[in-house]
């Protein structure tokens, strides 16, 4: 007798009983209000965790609005995650290649370096390099002080759950691991200060004014297989700028209240040539990253020095947007288009792969989590530091991020456009399309006072409505599964369309410089 195949529904844990969820799906799909509900779902791009707001207008009419959750994590909402990744691509590419989103085309000619700053080694872990993990050495009987073998002759794949796990958990420095994760934002801040000072010193050594160059950047934090974060950053040298204009305020937002000494506008910089080359910038990045230190209190009360690891990489970008020939190998991968796709891929990651949800955890929940012993040891170390080291008392609130308290994506003020500007432009476009649709229909507007809607009608001023949060998410797991499936289908359709469009472009004009973004 054969065992029937288990049904796995998209967006749900494999341990979920599918029968009641399927019943909910059928009930919703066969309901009288399905078409109205589906239009609402479609209006927010098949968001799987939509926010519902309710409000009353100046005349007392009730309005209901659905809006996206805008969560960047693919495990929470594939639709909003995909949109976040595409916005990130636009932001990074505009800053690297220019020519769109109010970024001048001249930025493509400026020195740019793609840098990766990693964490130090806190113990030997299993890896997936394509070769044997830790092959037997000349002394095959070598073991650690805990009598565990320091070798592994297996060749692990990227999906192997053992990748990133320490060969000996007792030898692994979990306190150093957690301290680095917690203080990584401060390490990055000090790195940017050190880099700006290094650039200024380079200019002074050549008898030039230190104000001739401004450092701009965008960075993305990625969690390695060993569950420690490292940084990918695209760093660019810009010309000095004029005073802030209203256009600066519109495009970049207000300046930081505490200052920062950054120039504000690229007005009149079309003929600027950087006195520092991309190769020299890469060397300055390497030097600055190696000299940065942060002294912190450890569990035993001693001072511990934190720093970046030895694997610091800094590679100049190629000149895709200027029509320069792009070679093969590394330089081909480091065109603006490639780097933008590379960074956009990482912003949608979450700790779901480590068995941790995006919601806050309690200390009591650590023992019951379905995670590896490595992750459990990290969580336990976080709680110990929160209890015993006074300056780190707040780390206990960041169990769900394994102690990382910074943003995944950050940028300097003038590197590129902002996520808010991209969303505002998209909202404006959507309103115009909806207005065109209503005008094309040539019908009288419905009575919005008695009909819940997914968007504020054009004849209702959103500023005159007092909006209140009503709830988030769908009414049942069945509804969420329907929406989740539709989101995946839309993403797949868009990707197929992009591949076909690029194929047609290649057939007509040949491969674009730098390749495509995948």
Where do the PLM segments sit?
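Helical (often loop-to-helix) elements that flank the catalytic cores of nucleotide-handling enzymes
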Residues: 234-301
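Short helix/loop capping segments that flank catalytic or ligand/cofactor-binding pockets
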Residues: 85-89, 93, 123-128, 242-245, ...
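Hydrophobic alpha-helical scaffolding
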Residues: 177, 181, 271-275, 307, ...
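Generic recognition of stable, solvent-exposed alpha-helical segments in well-folded globular domains
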Residues: 72, 182-186, 190, 276, ...
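Histidine-centered divalent-metal-coordination microenvironment in nucleic-acid enzymes
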Residues: 77, 115, 208-246, 343
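Generic, well-ordered alpha-helical scaffold segments in large soluble proteins
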Residues: 83, 190, 194, 198, ...
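Long, low-complexity, charged/polar intrinsically disordered accessory regions
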Residues: 1-85, 94, 304-518
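Signature for HUH/AEP ssDNA processing cores
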Residues: 97, 101-223
């Amino acid at each position: 007798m054969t065992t029937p195949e288990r049904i796995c529904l998209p967006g749900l844990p494999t341990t979920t009983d599918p029968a009641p969820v399927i019943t909910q799906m059928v009930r919703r799909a066969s309901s009288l209000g399905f078409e109205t509900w589906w239009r609402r779902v479609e209006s927010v791009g098949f968001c799987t965790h939509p926010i519902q707001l309710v409000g009353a207008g100046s005349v007392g009419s009730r309005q209901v609005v659905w809006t996206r959750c805008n969560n960047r994590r693919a495990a929470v909402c594939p639709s909003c995650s995909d949109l976040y990744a595409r916005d990130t691509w636009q932001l990074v590419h505009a800053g690297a290649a220019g020519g769109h989103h109010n970024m001048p085309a001249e930025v493509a000619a400026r020195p740019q370096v793609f840098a990766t700053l990693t964490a130090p080694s806190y113990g030997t872990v299993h890896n997936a390099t394509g070769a044997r993990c830790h092959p037997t050495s000349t002394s095959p009987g070598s073991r650690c002080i805990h009598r565990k073998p320091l070798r592994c002759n297996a060749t692990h794949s990227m999906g192997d759950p053992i990748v990133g796990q320490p060969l000996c958990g007792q030898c692994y420095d979990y306190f150093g691991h957690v301290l680095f994760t917690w203080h990584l934002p401060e390490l990055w801040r000090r790195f940017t200060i050190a880099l700006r000072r290094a650039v200024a010193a380079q200019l002074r050594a050549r008898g030039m004014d230190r104000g001739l160059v401004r450092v701009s950047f965008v960075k993305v934090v990625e969690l390695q297989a060993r569950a420690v974060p490292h940084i990918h950053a695209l760093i660019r040298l810009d010309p000095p700028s004029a005073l802030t204009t209203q256009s600066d305020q519109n495009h970049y937002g207000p300046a930081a209240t505490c200052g920062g000494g950054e120039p504000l506008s690229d007005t009149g910089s079309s003929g600027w040539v950087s006195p520092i080359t991309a190769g020299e910038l890469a060397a300055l990045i390497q030097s600055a990253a190696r000299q940065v230190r942060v002294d912190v209190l450890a569990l035993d009360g001693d001072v511990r020095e934190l720093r970046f690891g030895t694997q610091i990489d800094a590679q100049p970008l190629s000149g895709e947007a200027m029509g320069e020939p792009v070679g093969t190998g590394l330089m081909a991968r480091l065109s603006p288009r490639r780097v933008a796709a590379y960074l956009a891929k990482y912003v949608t990651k979450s700790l779901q792969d480590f068995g941790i949800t995006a919601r806050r955890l309690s200390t009591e929940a650590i023992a019951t989590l379905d995670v590896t012993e490595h992750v459990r040891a990290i969580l336990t170390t976080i709680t110990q530091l929160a209890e015993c080291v006074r300056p780190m008392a707040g780390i206990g609130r960041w169990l769900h991020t394994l102690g990382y308290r910074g943003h995944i994506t950050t940028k300097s003020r003038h590197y590129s456009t902002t996520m808010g500007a991209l969303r505002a432009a998209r909202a404006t476009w959507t309103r115009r399309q909806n207005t065109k649709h209503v005008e094309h229909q040539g019908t009288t507007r419905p009575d919005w006072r008695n009909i819940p809607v997914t968007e504020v009608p054009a004849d209702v001023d959103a500023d005159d409505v007092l909006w209140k949060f009503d709830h988030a998410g769908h009414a049942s797991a069945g509804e969420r599964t329907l929406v989740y499936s539709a989101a995946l289908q839309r993403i797949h359709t868009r990707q197929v369309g992009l591949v076909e469009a690029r194929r047609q472009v290649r057939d007509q004009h040949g491969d674009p410089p730098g390749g495509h973004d995948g």
